[in-house]
């Protein structure tokens, strides 16, 4: 049973992030980030996600050197493909906390990217404390032949383990950063009550994946919720 279905208010639909929190960095940083990622790939190039080899269709791969070729429709998202691990900071109803996270971005040659993010809370000494947020979904590009302006619009469809599904829309900001905002959100009867969100992802100096997320609070305003910097582990 769906208990809530609503869009983010129109005046919240443009992401405005302070310069100091912008993962995309200054002009030209995208080229440097891609070059740094290529250097780091020498250490991670031999790793990939495990797969079974007895299915009659292409296997998922998080390594662009292995498996099916990435669809041409996804070239603007190519830097995201891989396995990413690191730490971040969150803000919940019980205050601020630190978390560890792994994000797996893979594909099978289709016109979408698979997305899985798992996190765990850390204690004061940086050790595992408890399970955290988890989400899975798909990145796609909008295809509307009647509206050419939508050719670079991104769809991100997510299902959250906390009991809600979320549809984001956004666009690439640069060749290595992407900006998205919640367009619709549906909560199950047992799901947590949350507001819509804005996310900014970017490949930053050193080839890391960084992001910030703001969510709408009970008063209708955007407040900081999550931020993290993750290093490439595979791909």
Swiss-Prot record:
An example molecular function term from Gene Ontology annotations: peroxynitrite isomerase activity
Pathway field: Nitrogen metabolism
The keyword Isomerase is assigned to this record: yes
Catalytic activity: peroxynitrite = nitrate
Domain of life: Bacteria
EC number(s) recorded for this UniProt protein: 5.99.-.-
Cofactor: how and how many bound: Binds 1 heme b group per subunit, that coordinates a highly solvent-exposed Fe(III) atom.
UniProt motif (GXWXGXG) ranges: 82-88
Keywords from the UniProt entry: Heme, Iron, Isomerase, Metal-binding
Binding site for heme b: 198, 225
Subunit and partners: Homodimer.
Entry text on domains: Forms a 10-stranded antiparallel beta-barrel structure able to accommodate a hydrophobic ligand in its interior. In fact, this fold hosts the heme group, which is located in a wide surface cleft.
Name of the molecule in the record: Peroxynitrite isomerase 2
